[in-house]
């Protein structure tokens, strides 16, 4: 038997079937770095319209987790897609380098600043620690295939950035938005520092929930205010609190003037409660009912004096709108030191704070009974004292959502302290910020409502911290008047120049005399540092506006949805305070990573996915494909199983690319590419499908619907290409003459498609795209990352054998395949090429099918196809209206070369084992194809 293998155009390519991404990618990264790929891209886009995505800085502490990977991959995909669209889209990665966690980690090694190590040396240790963390994270981000200015990222601890952060503060002062206030702020007793709203997270905490009686000091005064009071026993106003430790600082009880209140009889005593809460209080006390003995409006008891439950003093009743009937008793324990609402209502009545608790959460020496006690450990002592005094009505344990420090994970307290604030009301800053929200494009669009509602309850922003490792608040305050120095703007600039040279130590080590001269004795140098959210929040000023290759405002900010209360807000507030405009045109948010069951990821549960492990096992491109395949507008499920499925999808994409490349053997686009009008009908259709898909893909990239790109790509590879077109052209590719028009037509189509395909996947599967690019035929200049979208030829509108025609043919092919498969399963035929197919067609179906003439058999991949008039009894019914299919085993010999069963096999004596078509393709001029 003759071996005809050498006469076939068998596929060949250097593009490997097995990806081996984990092994291959590091070498490609090295090559990218050696060839200065990022710089090549910048050079290629020089002078083009810019697209600026500003990187929200991750915190420089610990290894990157899957959430970091998602964020960086999304940014990289968008930037690469924008570059393909012709934009100059630089990417400057950044890191947030100051703050408490770094201090804590350094303290563990060298002790507290000012105790075992001086402040200058401590700050240097913090700087060294942060730099080491940055290097570790940077290595992983680069390994993900993220391109950017990794040699010159921005760090909030860079001297220049620190200096510009100080300048940003100076602008805010200059524009009249800064003030010093004595207000209750979230306070970490572990970190001994104030926290901004953005640094607070809510976790469940078990607290004592107690009902406490504040006895009415003058019963006659009470009766005169509310009218007659029936019943017997002492009258007490009852408060409910989950923070017993704040009772030593109690200075009042607040009620709502508009609410209805009652006096109820409870055993030997009478209690004052909001009428709407009587039932829930009775349930709490374990009684069936509490009989009402008087009713009145809250306004009636404004100013009424009550006895403090354990101190020999009286406190007044105040009126406050913050009092509701959501829970408790409708009477609210009021300690202006320890609650925002308490502070506001007390301020209205001229009641000042007591400052009973120090920065470490310890009661000061002047606090009766509790001096020296820690607020975390005093609840039981307070409850015992209340019991002793007969003032404890009820106690229970309550699990509730409670503010915690997002860094140390410890419960916070509210504590009134002197702090620096960016005022949200002064100069209408909040109003301007809310107005700016309307001019920003939020994706998804619910982001607008989310940030808007958060801004509604936005207090003045406390930007001061009592830390060692942070950008200093470089202000001088008059010792007597507490006013800022009149020349603050110039002084801030002077200090900024010094910080630019020597870092923030230039301020901490500064002798005020150097700047203030003789005035130095009258002024105090502020020793507080800035909230880290201020550092990152002003990067629109210190980075975007400061770097020559960037431009303000940025086109896009892209972070997790938690940043509506974090970086998006701090950036917007500072930008409005400095420039009077938003720092971004568009804000895109992604959801959180969760496990396959939708549960939050946690090391303790053991359901985390390590990006490092994924890259080492499956490769970065699989991780990148998972990110693109997932709808990131909601929570993003990830697990080993999900990633395994993604790896399968990746293989389909890779195999499709491999088919394209392996069938372009011997094809030189410079000499062999056919004009579109000379290509076969099926090939023109395939290119047109690619062009239509490209239009969809580009739209999806522009609207950030990456999961749609994945779905469309997958469908293109599996259905339109793998399930139809590529199957059909194999015969033509392998069996026709190497340089025949029929083969060059298919190769021209494959070339067009792979040129487009490699660009479609480049932003997502970057390593694979580069690998494809290097295996493509023809001379290449630059890389796939410096290229622009490929211009695909389109079919003429209304072409006879256009898209609708080939879609119909695809349905017919599916119907025929089903019938053949049924016969094969029954053992009646071996495969499609061993089958002779008869199509019983209605007139309209027959008309369409006969357009392809004898080439219909190549499309249906059968040895012979006969189209006959419709029959209601012959053949099997199909899903195609007007079509029945009959399949019979071919009686003809199988061609040893093309495997078709043809009647002319053996008729040529020189080639007794092959068909006439193959003889023509070997020895003659070659067969001619018109359609497929």
Swiss-Prot record:
Motif stretch ('HIGH' region): 58-68
EC number: 6.1.1.5
Cofactor note as given: Binds 1 zinc ion per subunit.
UniProt binding sites for Zn(2+): 895, 898, 915, 918
Subunit relationships: Monomer.
Domain notes: IleRS has two distinct active sites: one for aminoacylation and one for editing. The misactivated valine is translocated from the active site to the editing site, which sterically excludes the correctly activated isoleucine. The single editing site contains two valyl binding pockets, one specific for each substrate (Val-AMP or Val-tRNA(Ile)).
Name used for this protein in its record: Isoleucine--tRNA ligase
Organism per entry: Saccharophagus degradans (strain 2-40 / ATCC 43961 / DSM 17024)
């Amino acid at each position: 038997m003759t071996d005809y293998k050498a006469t076939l155009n068998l596929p060949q390519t250097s593009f490997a079937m097995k990806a081996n991404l984990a092994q291959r990618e590091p070498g490609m990264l090295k090559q990218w770095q050696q060839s200065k790929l990022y710089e090549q891209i910048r050079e290629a886009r020089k002078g083009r319209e810019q697209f600026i995505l500003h990187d929200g800085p991750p915190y420089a502490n610990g290894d990157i987790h899957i959430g970091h990977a998602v964020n960086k991959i999304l940014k990289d995909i968008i930037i690469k897609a924008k570059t393909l669209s012709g934009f100059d889209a630089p990417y400057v990665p950044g890191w947030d380098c100051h703050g408490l966690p770094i201090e804590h980690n350094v303290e563990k090694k060298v002790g507290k600043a000012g105790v075992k190590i001086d402040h200058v040396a401590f700050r240097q240790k913090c700087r060294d620690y942060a730099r080491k963390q940055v290097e570790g994270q940077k290595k992983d981000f680069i390994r993900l295939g993220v391109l950017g200015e990794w040699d010159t990222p921005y760090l909030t601890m860079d001297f220049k950035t620190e200096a510009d952060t100080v300048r940003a503060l100076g602008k805010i002062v200059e524009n009249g938005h800064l003030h010093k206030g004595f207000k209750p702020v979230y306070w970490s007793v572990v970190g001994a520092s104030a926290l901004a709203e953005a640094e607070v997270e809510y976790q469940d905490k078990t607290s004592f929930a107690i009902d406490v009686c504040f006895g009415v000091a003058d019963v006659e005064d009470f009766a005169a205010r509310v009218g007659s009071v029936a019943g017997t026993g002492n009258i007490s106003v009852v408060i409910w609190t989950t923070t017993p430790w704040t009772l030593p600082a109690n200075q009042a009880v607040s009620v709502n003037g508009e609410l209805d209140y009652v006096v109820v009889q409870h055993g030997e005593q009478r209690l004052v409660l909001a009428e709407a809460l009587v039932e829930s209080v009775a349930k709490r006390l374990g009684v069936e009912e509490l009989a009402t003995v008087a009713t009145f409006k809250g306004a009636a008891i404004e100013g009424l004096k009550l006895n403090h439950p354990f101190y020999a003093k009286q406190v007044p009743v105040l009126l406050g709108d913050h009092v509701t009937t959501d829970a408790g008793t409708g009477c609210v324990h009021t300690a202006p030191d320890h609650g925002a609402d308490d502070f506001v209502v007390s301020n209205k009545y001229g009641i000042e704070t007591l400052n009973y608790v120090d920065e470490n959460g310890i009661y000061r020496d002047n606090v009766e009974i509790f001096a020296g006690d820690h607020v975390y450990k005093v609840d039981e002592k307070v409850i015992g004292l209340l019991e002793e005094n007969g003032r404890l009505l009820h106690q229970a344990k309550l699990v509730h959502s409670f503010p915690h420090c997002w860094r140390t994970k410890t419960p916070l307290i509210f504590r009134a302290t002197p702090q620096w604030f960016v005022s949200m009301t002064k100069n209408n800053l909040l109003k301007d910020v809310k107005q700016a929200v309307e001019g920003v494009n939020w994706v998804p669009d619910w982001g607008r409502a989310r940030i808007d509602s958060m801004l509604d309850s936005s207090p003045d922003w406390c930007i001061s911290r009592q830390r060692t490792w942070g950008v200093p608040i470089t202000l001088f305050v008059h010792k007597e008047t507490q006013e800022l120095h009149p020349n603050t703007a110039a002084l801030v600039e002077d200090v900024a120049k010094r910080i630019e040279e020597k870092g923030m130590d230039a301020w901490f080590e500064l002798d005020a005399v150097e700047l203030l001269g003789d005035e130095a004795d009258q002024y105090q140098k502020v020793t507080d540092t800035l909230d880290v959210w201020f550092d990152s929040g002003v990067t629109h000023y210190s980075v975007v506006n400061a770097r020559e290759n960037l431009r303000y405002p940025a086109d896009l900010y892209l972070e997790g949805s938690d940043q509506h209360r974090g970086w998006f807000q701090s950036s917007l507030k500072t930008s409005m305070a400095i420039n009077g405009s938003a720092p971004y045109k568009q804000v895109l948010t992604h959801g959180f990573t969760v496990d396959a069951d939708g549960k939050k990821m946690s090391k303790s549960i053991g359901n985390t996915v390590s990006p490092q492990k994924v890259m080492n096992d499956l490769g970065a491109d699989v991780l990148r494909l998972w990110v693109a395949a997932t709808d990131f507008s909601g929570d993003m499920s990830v697990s080993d199983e999900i990633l395994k499925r993604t790896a399968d999808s990746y293989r389909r994409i890779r195999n499709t690319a491999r088919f394209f490349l392996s069938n372009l053997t011997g094809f030189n686009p410079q000499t062999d590419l056919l004009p579109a009008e000379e290509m076969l009908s099926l090939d023109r259709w395939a290119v047109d499908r690619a062009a239509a898909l490209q239009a969809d893909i580009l739209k999806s990239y522009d609207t950030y619907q990456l999961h749609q790109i994945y779905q469309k790509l997958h469908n293109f590879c599996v259905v339109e290409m793998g399930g139809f077109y590529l199957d059909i052209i194999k015969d033509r590719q392998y069996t026709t003459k190497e340089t025949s028009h029929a083969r060059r037509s298919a190769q021209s189509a494959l070339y067009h498609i792979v040129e487009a395909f490699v660009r479609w996947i480049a932003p997502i599967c970057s390593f694979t795209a580069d690998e494809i690019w290097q295996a493509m035929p023809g001379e290449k200049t630059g890389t796939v990352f410096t290229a622009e979208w490929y211009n695909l030829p389109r079919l003429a509108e209304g072409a006879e054998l256009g898209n609708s025609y080939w879609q119909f043919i695809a349905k017919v092919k599916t119907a025929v395949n089903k019938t053949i498969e049924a016969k094969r399963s029954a053992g009646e035929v071996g495969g499609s090429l061993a089958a002779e197919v008869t199509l019983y067609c209605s007139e309209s179906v027959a008309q369409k099918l006969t357009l392809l003439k004898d080439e219909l058999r190549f499309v249906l991949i059968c040895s012979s196809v006969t189209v006959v008039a419709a029959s209601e009894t012959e053949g099997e019914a199909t899903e195609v209206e007007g079509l029945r299919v009959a399949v019979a085993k071919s009686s003809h010999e199988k061609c040893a070369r093309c495997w078709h069963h043809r009647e002319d096999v053996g008729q040529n004596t020189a080639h007794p084992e092959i068909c006439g078509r193959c003889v023509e393709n070997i020895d003659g001029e070659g067969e001619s194809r018109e359609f497929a």
